[in-house]
Amino acid sequence: MLIEIPNVFSKQEVSHLREQLDARRWIDGNQTSGAMATTRKRNQQLDKDDPVAVALGQQIMDRLLAHPQFVSAALPLQFYPPLFNRYQGGETFGYHIDNAIRSTPDGMIRTDLSATLFLSEPESYQGGELVIQDTYGQQSIKLSAGSLVLYPSSSLHQVTPVLSGERTAAFMWLQSMVRDEGQRRLLFQLDQSIQTLTAQQAAEQELFNLTGIYHNLLRRWSEL
C-alpha cells in the first residue's frame, strides 16, 4: 500500500526547515547504506548525530504522530529517527530494498514502512523521482515540498539521477504495530470508512459496530 499525504508541513514551515538544513555540513550519504547499496548510492546526508538534524527529525516525528491519516495508515510502533539527504549534479540511488532490521539507541526495529518527506518543490529540480515497484506496478513519485509518501520497506525502489537543481528530503523507517501489509491495508480502509461515515452522521449503531470490528481486528493482529 502506497499512501501520499499532502501538506504535512506548510510552505512556510518547509522554508524554515530548509534554512536550518542548508546551513549544516553535509557528508557522504553511504553512512546509512547496507553493503549492497554502497555501489548504487551517490548522494549527501546530514550526520545522524548532527544536533539540528536530531531536533528537526523529532519535529517531523511529532507532526506525523499527530496526523490522523498517517497514524491510520502506518499504525506506528517505533521510528528509526528521520535522516536528511540531498541530491544534485547527477547524484542518484539505484534500485534497492531497504534493510529489514535497523539499530536505534533504544534497540532493534523491524522496518515495515519507509517514508520520504519532500523538502524541495518539484519544479526546482530535474529528475530525482522516487520510483517504487509495488504490487500494482511501477509508480513514480515527485511531490510538492511538505508532502510525504509512505510505502512498504519491502518495495524495490530508486531515486533517479538529479540532472539539475537540488532535491532535499527527509527519509525514515518505522515498525508498525501490524506486521502484515495486507492486514494494515484492511485496517486502513476500514478506519477511513468509519471516519467518512462519522462525517456523514451515519447511524450510531452501525458506526458502533464497525468501530468494534476495527478494534477487535487490531487486537488480533497487533504485535507490541
Curated annotation (Swiss-Prot):
| Gene Ontology BP, a term | DNA damage response
- Which Pfam families does the annotation name? 2OG-FeII_Oxy_3, PKHD_C
Task: Give the highest taxon in the source lineage.
Answer: Bacteria
Query: Which cofactors does it use?
Result: Fe(2+); L-ascorbate
- What keywords would UniProt list here? Dioxygenase, Iron, Metal-binding, Oxidoreductase, Vitamin C
Provide the cofactor note recorded for this chain's UniProt entry: Binds 1 Fe(2+) ion per subunit.
Enzyme Commission designation? 1.14.11.-
**Positions of Fe cation binding:** 96, 98, 157
Q: Name one GO molecular function term.
A: L-ascorbic acid binding
Q: Which InterPro entries match?
A: Oxoglu/Fe-dep_dioxygenase_dom, PKHD_C, PKHD_hydroxylase, Pro_4_hyd_alph, Pro_4_hyd_alph_FE2OG_OXY
SMART domains recorded: P4Hc (SM00702)
The record's annotation in PROSITE patterns points to: FE2OG_OXY
* Residue intervals of the Fe2OG dioxygenase domain: 78-176
- Cross-referenced Gene3D superfamilies: q2cbj1_9rhob like domain, Rabenosyn, Rab binding domain
Question: Which residues of the sequence carry a binding annotation for 2-oxoglutarate?
Answer: 167
Transmembrane regions listed in the UniProt entry: none
Q: Give the PANTHER family listed for this entry.
A: PKHD-TYPE HYDROXYLASE YBIX
Protein name per Swiss-Prot or TrEMBL: PKHD-type hydroxylase Shew185_0721
* Organism, scientific name: Shewanella baltica (strain OS185)
